[in-house]
Amino acid sequence: MRMPCRLALALLLCFAGPACFAASGPVRVLSVDGAIGPASADYLVRGIERAAEDGAQLVVLELDTPGGLDASMRRIVKAILASQVPVAGFVAPSGARAASAGTYILYACHIAAMAPGTNLGAATPVRLGTPDKPAEKPPARDAGPMARKQVNDAAAYIRGLAQLRGRNAEWAERAVREAVSLAAHEAAAQKVIDLQ
């Protein structure tokens, strides 16, 4: 699905300003529709690198994900943080979500945007289920040391991303510790995202 022209223009103007019109480059759109794993991490990392090689002005990550693997999410976050090209995260189309790992990725982006009718959050680390063992629920406050370590690490990680990008760090930590979620209009009002 194509990004609405109004949003594309707003994102471009946020980063390029007047210099954009002197030497404009392409806007690269990379889409993820599904779980975050090694394949999606490879796709996004390579796409961000190629955008820089091609002289892109902006990379737009169009996200619709229920979350995924921690290691893959962290690879993507590192690529965004190291990117020479501004990266805008856009949760779209309407009805999409950036849950769990998607929330961290959106927080890492230079600019975060959501289409109306989308949501983000529920970023508590959970162990993935197997056919003989269902996925676990978010760890309780009285969980064992390993679960507490995972939650504390995840909370510090997303808080750091929020502080880096000037976004709502308190809500980010709640998304990890309490598995809370927000709709797009609430996320904009609470300064979790930059544009809706």
Where are these regions (language model features)?
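Bacterial N-terminal signal peptides
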Residues: A8-A19
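Bacterial N-terminal signal peptides that target proteins for export
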Residues: M1-L9
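Soluble extramembrane regions of membrane proteins in the secretory/endomembrane system
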Residues: C20-Q196
